[in-house]
Amino acid sequence: MKRVLMLLALVLAPSLPARAAPPETPVLTLDEALRIARTNHPQLQAARAQTEASAARVGMARAPLLPQLSGNASYTRSSGKASSATSTGLSVPLSSGNSYSLGVNASQLLYDFGLGTGKYKAAQATLGAQEQTERNLAVHVAFNLRSAYYTAAAARALLKVAEETLHNRELHLRQIQAFVEVGKRPEIDLVQSRTDRANAQVQLIQAQVAYDTDRALLNQAMGVERDIRYDVVAPPAQALQGEDGDTVSLLEVALSARPDVMALARQIDAQELSTRSIRGGYAPSLSASAGVSENANQLDSWQLGWNARLLLSWQLFGGGITDGQVRESRASTAALRAQYELLRQQVRVDVEQARLAVRAAKAAIAAAHEAAQNARVRLTLAEGRYQAGVGNVIELSDSQVALTSALAQEVQAIFTLDLARARLLRAIGQL
């Protein structure tokens, strides 16, 4: 009977639906994360809106320099009464009627000694500064994204270390349990192994929570709300161009490419142009205007008229307000120049720190990799010694702890190099 059931099961097995394989966890690449952040991050959206507003202010500053054209149309109905009485003692209307008017007027500023053109050029320079400010924010968003991505990738690598540690602890537990059952090892070895496995389980839970948390922070760095059920894998390490160069060459690149440096330089230009514009208030302005109009009391009796005017306007005394505005603008320019020098010094520090951090991290990776290899060999030797009966459970446990620590240090070394290169990118103003 059992044989019949077994044959029936073999016959029916191919017809049974196969269990669907679990879907693979999607992988979010660094390039994709950067693209999402550049498109969706709220800070960048706000910066783009501010740039659009600055561009609109350029148009507003240009408007007074262009011809101004206006039109008007009016209709008036009027009536009046005499001030003297008639023979009947009553006042009677003297006049009443309609009035129609149509007109077009044009005006043009001819010259104002740089008052209007200075405001326009200052607005253009301010727009340039805002564009660089937007780019500088994009550089910082990219750095924060890389930092969050590399942190999540390191957390995933540490999760793999925790999984390997738990797997090794379970293997050791089964081996030790078998030795204890046959009397080759004391009961205390089994208790120690169970404790080590429990600790490994706790470490695995903590590593999983850390990975989940870092993916949530990565979502925030991308500026999106999305599920965290995806994996991140750090791309292969690639050296940055010039990362092994000296500080002087990297500093030249940074000063010519960093958007915060260029933004402050444009702010200085805008302030100087604003000063020139204010000084135009000392001089007169010359404008011209002309108009054409038609007036009528009846719709069939229009009369054409025109006018033209040249206007020279000059504020002879304004209580010293122009002097005060000029002094204020010059002081603001001096303050911006001081900030510019301070920023140049900070750029040098940023470049120096990032360059040294990259060099130190590259050296640490080789040492961390060697330490991990030695720790793995040590664990293999400890396992062999324990199975041969010449080692003890403490030696075995310590070897596993040493391997876990060495693997974690290797992950940390890789993360440190990735983050150092990200800082160097930010220091030289690269996206």
Question: What spans do the regions from the language model cover?
Answer:
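Bacterial N-terminal signal peptides
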Residues: 6-15
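Acidic, low-complexity, intrinsically disordered peripheral segments
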Residues: 19-23, 79, 226, 407-431
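Bacterial Sec-pathway N-terminal export signals of envelope proteins
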Residues: 20-74, 109-110, 226, 232-268, ...
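Small/polar-residue-enriched beta-strand and adjacent coil segments characteristic
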Residues: 29, 68-136, 257, 262-343, ...
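Amphipathic alpha-helical coiled-coil segments
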Residues: 46-61, 137, 141-162, 171-174, ...
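Transmembrane beta-barrel architecture of outer-membrane proteins
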Residues: 99-101, 147, 192-195, 305-307, ...
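Short, charged, amphipathic alpha-helical segments
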Residues: 124, 187-195, 393-401
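Periplasmic alpha-helical coiled-coil/stalk elements that build and connect Gram-negative outer-membrane
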Residues: 137-253, 354-357, 361, 410
